Amino acid sequence: MKTVILFSFLLVLLGCLEAGHAQRDPEFSSKARQMLAVFGNSEVDRYTKSRNLPALIEFYEKYSSRLPLTVQDRTYANNVVRRYRAQNNQQVDGVPAQGGIGLAFALLLPFAMSIVEGIAKAIRE
């Protein structure tokens, strides 16, 4: 009897894990395609890309484990995210600093390209 209960519990657990995995895939694919549409398209202007940088950072932080990046690219991306967060958290006279998007864009452009390549590989898999 114990083995039947244990086996049933195992089947329920596997079913829950599979259902959770299936629910995340459409969200990942949808967001990945959005990031590719903005950052993987050479016709998208710089302003649009810079406006979508926070979304790319959020995407990377949420799905970095699912992106097939080299160790070097992953280390670089983590450093860039940390520097980006530090820059955004700077305060001048008690309020967030204004401007500086050009610097942030220049800092994040190589990061964006490596992430876009990782996203494209992840979608193909």
From Swiss-Prot:
Main location: secreted
GO biological process: cellular response to heat; cellular response to UV; innate immune response; response to bacterium; response to heat; response to UV; response to virus
Pfam families: Turandot (PF07240)
Residues of the signal peptide: 1-22
CC terms in the record's Gene Ontology section: extracellular space
The keyword Acetylation belongs to this UniProt entry's keyword annotation: no
Compartment(s): Secreted
Keyword set, alphabetical order: Immunity, Innate immunity, Secreted, Signal
Top-level taxon of the source organism: Eukaryota
Transmembrane segments: none
Function: A humoral factor that may play a role in stress tolerance.
Protein family membership: Belongs to the Turandot family.
Protein name per UniProt: Protein Turandot F
Provenance organism: Drosophila simulans (Fruit fly)
Gene it is expressed from: TotF
